[in-house]
Amino acid sequence: MYQLRFEQKIPTNIENVWNFISDPRNLKKITPSYMGFQITNEPIAEKMYAGMIIAYKVTPLLSIPMQWVTEITHVQEMEYFVDEQRIGPYTLWHHQHRISEIEGGTLMQDIVSYKPPFGPLGI
C-alpha cells in the first residue's frame, strides 16, 4: 500500500472551507479539468454524509472514460470526511480530507492511502 499527503493553507475561516469541501456539488470545481470529472448519480445532496454514494465518470488517460464510485464513510463536522472507492481503478482507495484552524486561516490536509491494481505491475 502507498500513501500520498498534501496540505495547503487557505486564507479563510474554517466554516467557509468546510461548507465548500463538504458540498459534493463542488467536486468538479476542485478536480483538474483534464480529468473530465462528471457526477453521474445526480441529483445529489448539498452536504456529504456517512453512507453517501457518489458515482462519477473521469477521463484521466487517453480520453478513455472510466466509471468510479466512492462512498463517504466518515464525516466529522468541521474536521474531516473520508471517501473510499467502491468501484474504480484501484485495489484500495481511502482518502481523508482534514481541516484545522491555523493562524490566518485554515490548514487543509489530504491523506490518500491506495493500492494500485495488478500488484507490483501496477506501480
Residue map of PLM features:
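Hydrophobic pocket/interface hotspot
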Residues: 16-21, 27, 54-56, 72, ...
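Hydrophobic ligand-binding cavity/cleft-lining segments
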Residues: 1-49
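Glycine-rich portal/gate segments that line the openings of hydrophobic small-molecule binding cavities
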Residues: 39-87, 104
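Short, surface-exposed coil-to-beta transition loops
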Residues: 3-5, 65-69, 91-96
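Generic structural detector for well-ordered beta-strands
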Residues: 5-11, 38, 57, 71, ...
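Phosphate-binding glycine-rich loops and adjacent basic patches that engage nucleotide phosphates
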Residues: 14-15, 31-35, 56-62, 97-109
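Beta-strand/loop substructures that line and gate deep hydrophobic ligand-binding cavities in soluble
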Residues: 85-123
